[in-house]
Amino acid sequence: MAGSSYGNIFKVTTWGESHGKGLGVVVDGVPAGLELCEEDIQIFLNRRKPGQSKFTTPRKEDDTVEILSGVFEGKTTGTPVSMVVWNKNQKSKDYSEIASYYRPGHADFCFDEKYGFRDYRGGGRSSGRETIGRVAAGAIAVKMLSSLGIKFLTYTRSIGPVTINEVNFDAHEIYNNSLYMPDSDAAQKASEYLDECLKSLNSSGGVCECVITGLPVGLGDPVFEKIDANLAKAIMSIGAVKGFEIGDGFDAAKATGLTNNDAFIMMDGAVSKETNHSGGTLGGMTDGSPLIFRAAIKPTPSIAATQHTVNKSGEDIEISIKGRHDPIIVPRAVVVVEAMAAITIADALLMNMGARMDRITDFYKKL
């Protein structure tokens, strides 16, 4: 299977299946000298691990990370950083029935058609647990970028019909509720909505939003390495994501040039913008203002409600999916979205080092 790697210099390769022995990641291109320990990674993995509220799968996994290579005496060595999380609470018997039919909303049919074979236990490679490797790699990227003053604020913007009210936005509230919403009133309404979904054996989708501050001007390259294009690829590669928009996104299509353009102004002796309809990018490069994007996440496809499908013999059947599944993916996806954004920014930053001859000259003059 191709396609398990992402990035150019800061390159991430994930491996493992939901019900295999474990899952992990190899991260190439991590600069030497970054202080790093397993706790730095664990903090991020704890944000995505299951069993933390009634709105996540009851599958209990510690998701404890082990760093296998690339770190010595508390610092990265510049060699590949390899990490693993061992699976401990697989219940593969919950999935024995689905080997013979195709679950609506899942990749079962496509896997069978493409490869002629699939690991049906928990979705195998297409399981949400694949994101463990992404989050572990993203934790490294976030630590690397935070040392440069680049910060990430990622949260749940909406769940089903419930959207946060900008007037009530409180960043401190994000970690005060299990839905990671920066609006306590919206979080309460969303919880009530999800309770109804659970009662009706159904699930819900939602939207994650990410705001990145402290970015320099010029990350990303015009044409095929645009920062917004690479972010779109990174975010859309997350299994449940079905849409991506940056800045005003699709609303820009309803605007005029005069209302959509961000006027430039001088502020504190530097070029700035009056507004940020562009979401922090121009011409495929960061423009120094906050980079803002959103990811639309579909409802969990594994639901207990009766659904129509077909089996591998081509017969029409009805199914009710058993097992341990999230009624909503969004809260656990928040950190995955942040991780993929950080990986993309870290890669763009390292690629940017060779953009100008004067920077290369200045560097080598010091040697």
UniProtKB/Swiss-Prot annotation:
What Enzyme Commission number(s) apply to this enzyme? 4.2.3.5
Give, as in the UniProt entry, the pathway in which the protein acts. Metabolic intermediate biosynthesis; chorismate biosynthesis; chorismate from D-erythrose 4-phosphate and phosphoenolpyruvate: step 7/7
What does this protein's record comment on cofactor binding?
Reduced FMN (FMNH(2)).
Task: List residues binding FMN.
Answer: R125, S126, S127, G283, K298, P299, T300, P301, S302, R324
**GO annotation, biological process:** amino acid biosynthetic process; aromatic amino acid family biosynthetic process; chorismate biosynthetic process
- Catalyses which reaction(s): 5-O-(1-carboxyvinyl)-3-phosphoshikimate = chorismate + phosphate
**What top-level branch of life does the organism fall under?**
Bacteria
Chain sites annotated for binding NADP(+): R48
Alphabetic keyword roster = Amino-acid biosynthesis, Aromatic amino acid biosynthesis, FAD, Flavoprotein, FMN, Lyase, NADP
Entry's Pfam families? Chorismate_synt
Which cellular component, as a GO term, is one annotated location? cytosol
Q: Which cofactor does it need?
A: FMNH2
Query: Which GO-annotated molecular functions does the record name?
Result: chorismate synthase activity; FMN binding
- Purpose: This reaction introduces a second double bond into the aromatic ring system.
Q: Which family does it belong to?
A: Belongs to the chorismate synthase family.
Subunit (UniProt): Homotetramer.
Q: This chain belongs to which protein, by name?
A: Chorismate synthase
Q: Which species is the source of this protein?
A: Agathobacter rectalis (strain ATCC 33656 / DSM 3377 / JCM 17463 / KCTC 5835 / VPI 0990) (Eubacterium rectale)
